[in-house]
Structures are given as C-alpha cells and as structure tokens.
Amino acid sequence: MASVGGTLRGNGYLWGKKSINQVKLLSMKPTLFVLAAGMGSRYGGLKQIDGLGPHGETIMDYSIYDAIRAGFGKVVFVIRRDFEQAFREKIVSKYDRLIPVELVFQSVDKIPYSYKVPEERTKPWGTNHAVMMGEEVIHEPFAVINADDFYGRESFEALADFLRSVEGKE
C-alpha cells in the first residue's frame, strides 16, 4: 500500500501519511512466533517440551513469560503434527487462558504452488519454511524465536518496542 496523503490507495483511506491499516497495525500488540518443530535428533527427544526449571519450566516458558510482560498479545507455535497432543498438554494448556495461542504445522509438502517436493524429501525445509506456516494466522507485526534458546526479558522488551513503532508496510 502506498502512503500518499489525501488519496485512496490500496484497501484503506489515508490519514495524513498513515493509512487506516497502518493505524490499526500500530495499535495491535505484536505476535510471538515460536519455532518449535525441531526434531531433537542430537538431544534424543523433544527438548522444546522438556522441563529444566525448578518447577519443570521449559525454555519456552521463560520466553513466553517475558514476551507477555513486554506486551506481546498472541503466541503462534509452529510444530509437527506427530507431537501435537503432547505439545497441547504440556505447553498450550499453560497459556491458552492468558493469551491467544495458535498452532500451525510444518509439513514438507506445504510449499509455494510453483515448487514440487522431490519424492525422497522427508524433512521440512528449514526456518524460512517454518515462518511461512504462520501466514494465515499472523496479521500483525511479529517476532520469530527458537523454542530452545533463552533470550531474556530485555530482548523481548526491545522487540516489542520496535514492533510497536514500525509502520505497517505491504
């Protein structure tokens, strides 16, 4: 959408230099997009749902707590279907009453229509592919984190501040 004052462009009226869509984006809380579909092959299991804190907290628990306190308004997890039930029980059940939570699934065959999946391909396509899985549920500024990395409170505050300050661009 072009940002030209005083004219109608794209799908929203412009207010000065900001469109209605941009004003809506500025008032939205950012979304936290968590990459949690890892195979855990070196670890030997699903490290993203294994507890390590004094009360069984996962690394994700610390990140989500910090993100909520920083002002994030929704959490979207990208996971694999084969551990959906365990993930819902261990992770989603903790947060779905505190903040909107969405699950999206990474699948090797969910790719842009102009591409063809090689028959021998069994593994997902990586980080960019995982982020593409969120396109139908994320309509606001968002930050992407790994489920098994610790970032700290200050990182989420900086991310949220930045995402709230960004004008919507299409």
Name these PLM-found stretches.
Residues 2-4, 23:
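Acidic, Ala/Val/Gly-enriched low-complexity intrinsically disordered segments
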Residues 45-46:
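Conserved catalytic-core motifs of eukaryotic protein kinase domains, centered on the activation segment
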